[in-house]
């Protein structure tokens, strides 16, 4: 069995592809896997590092307005489709799987034209422009958040699979995680705005921590992210007259390296609303306060967060309304009632799909069998 994957640009498009590829390999060890990406995207480093071969094509994303860049991108597409066809004819895949990002556009379009089974996976509640276009050509659209189906009415076939999560996050028991972190009965709140950090998110979170530090009501773990975010956050504490070293119930670090343990031990998570983060939160049934990033394309995170909010698994604070006061109100409302905390966790778990990778693998195999 041969599977060609296309997707990239950001980790949010690459990690689902890797999760699916690794799961297929676990189930069928003789499967040949190949990737297509661009040299400018993160896939250029992540895919080879993960042990998979990759070919590159030249293509860029469309801008949201008419410009020279948009015209240049349009001019690149015929060559990108031709290059994709060449790669496909050489590798001879049984199925081509796209996981989002502009690179999967020409690859899946080329595969569809060559009558090879195709599946595109969309992780966000509001599908990107590439998925919307491809939905008219591919055999199947697998959606990570069920709300997404209403935005792709022209799709031939839509199946809800959820978004793949790291298997390691599913194997940690809550009681063992809390024991490992030496937690007591106080609510344990973890806060992170992403691996690169988020300036305004971090400022508000730091201000909230300062406002509750002396109450010792919570155990708090905050990951600031990189790009000098840690220094900026620590300066924020200093400006507020708070020395976090004096509080054994507050931990501030650049990155939360034991995220599997921390997430499972947490009573409440405060985070952005990227699709991968939400997949993990719901897979383990974790209540959350979501602060969607206003800086992402098509306001994806707002749509993602509102979907979880409607399901009763999270509260949402728009960044424009984010402050120590709004965070405190949301945290207090959730953790003050054990019943509400449990109810939100249950609702979150109802939206989770821990076996997402298996579901997608099943669809991939179904497409291959159907084409035999």
At which residue positions do the language-model features occur?
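Conserved nucleotide-sugar phosphate-binding/catalytic loop shared by glycosyltransferases and other
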Residues: 3-7, 30-81, 193, 320
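Conserved donor-binding/catalytic loop of nucleotide-activated donor transferases
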Residues: 114, 264-266, 280-292
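A short, well-ordered alpha-helix in the C-terminal region of glycosyltransferases
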Residues: 340-354
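Active-site-proximal region of nucleotide-activated glycan assembly enzymes
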Residues: 31, 42, 53, 112-175
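C-terminal alpha-helical cap of glycosyltransferases
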Residues: 353-372
């Amino acid at each position: 069995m041969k599977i060609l994957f296309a997707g990239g640009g950001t980790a949010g498009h690459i990690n689902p592809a890797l999760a699916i590829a690794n799961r297929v390999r676990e189930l069928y060890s003789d499967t040949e896997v190949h990737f297509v990406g661009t040299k400018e995207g993160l896939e250029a480093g992540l895919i080879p590092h993960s042990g998979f071969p990759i070919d590159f094509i030249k293509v860029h994303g469309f801008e949201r307005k008419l410009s020279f860049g948009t015209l240049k991108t349009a001019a690149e597409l015929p060559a990108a489709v031709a290059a994709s066809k060449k790669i496909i004819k050489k590798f001879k895949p049984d199925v081509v799987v796209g996981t989002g990002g502009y690179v999967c556009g020409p690859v899946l379009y080329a595969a569809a034209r060559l009558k090879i089974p195709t599946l595109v996976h969309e992780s966000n509640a509001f599908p990107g422009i590439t998925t919307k276009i491809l939905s008219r050509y591919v055999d199947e659209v697998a959606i990570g958040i069920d709300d997404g189906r209403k935005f792709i009415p022209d799709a031939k076939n839509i199946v809800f699979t959820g978004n793949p999560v790291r298997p390691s996050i599913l194997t940690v028991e809550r009681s063992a995680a809390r024991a490992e972190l030496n937690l007591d009965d106080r609510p344990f709140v973890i806060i992170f705005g992403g691996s690169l950090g988020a300036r305004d998110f971090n400022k508000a979170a730091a201000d909230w921590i300062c406002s509750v530090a002396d109450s010792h009501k919570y155990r708090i773990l905050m990951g600031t992210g990189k790009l000098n975010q840690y220094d900026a956050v620590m300066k924020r504490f200093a400006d507020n007259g708070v020395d976090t070293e004096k509080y054994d119930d507050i931990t501030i670090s650049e990155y939360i390296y034991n995220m599997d343990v921390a997430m499972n031990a947490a009573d409440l998570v405060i985070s952005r609303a990227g699709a991968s983060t939400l997949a993990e939160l719901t897979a383990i049934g974790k209540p959350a306060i979501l602060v969607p990033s206003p800086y992402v394309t098509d306001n994806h995170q707002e749509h993602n967060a509102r979907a979880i909010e409607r399901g009763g698994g999270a509260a949402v604070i728009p960044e424009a309304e984010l402050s120590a006061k709004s965070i405190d109100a949301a945290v207090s409302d959730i953790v003050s009632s054990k019943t509400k905390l449990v109810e939100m966790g249950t609702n979150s778990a109802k939206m989770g799909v821990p076996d997402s990778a298996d579901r997608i693998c099943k669809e991939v195999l179904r497409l291959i069998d159907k084409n035999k």
